[in-house]
């Protein structure tokens, strides 16, 4: 894992340009993507301080045939597009902290993943559900802090 300072330098210096071209295709947006990643890392540092982190990209998608896997019994044809959400993520013991864009921070204790009526239909409940599902299926979960932007 690299530090946020090292990660930012990789993007600002152009060392990650080949990766950015591979993900986003459009050469004309290279400067924009470099700055976008640097800004996301800076925001992560403002929220959580400097330290080791990783970067993840979740591509957007477009449905070509079918829509919503839950309505189609998993039978849809989708394609990824070169728009995405990126997350800057660092490890944290026992707690999950997530900030998405300008939304307030969500904080979840890994010791409290039970369903709560007052949390239903919230982003917090979705995150808790994924974590609980991983744990219930034998997966190992750990705490993290993340800043996400799209």
How would you name each of these model-derived features?
Residues 2-150:
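ATP-binding N-lobe of GHMP and related small-molecule kinases
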């Amino acid at each position: 894992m690299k530090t946020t300072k090292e990660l930012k330098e990789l993007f600002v210096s152009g060392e990650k340009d080949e990766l950015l071209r591979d993900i986003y295709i459009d050469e004309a947006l290279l400067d924009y993507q470099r700055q976008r990643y640097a800004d996301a890392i800076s925001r992560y540092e403002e929220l959580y301080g400097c330290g080791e982190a990783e970067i993840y990209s979740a591509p957007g998608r477009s449905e070509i045939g079918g829509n919503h896997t839950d309505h189609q019994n998993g039978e849809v044809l989708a394609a990824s597009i070169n728009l995405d959400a990126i997350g800057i993520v660092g490890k944290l013991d026992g707690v999950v902290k997530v900030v998405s864009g300008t939304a307030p921070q969500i904080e979840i204790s890994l010791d409290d993943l039970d369903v709560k009526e007052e949390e239903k239909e919230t982003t917090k409940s979705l995150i808790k559900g994924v974590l609980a599902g991983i744990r219930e299926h034998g997966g190992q979960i750990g705490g993290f802090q993340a800043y996400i932007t799209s």
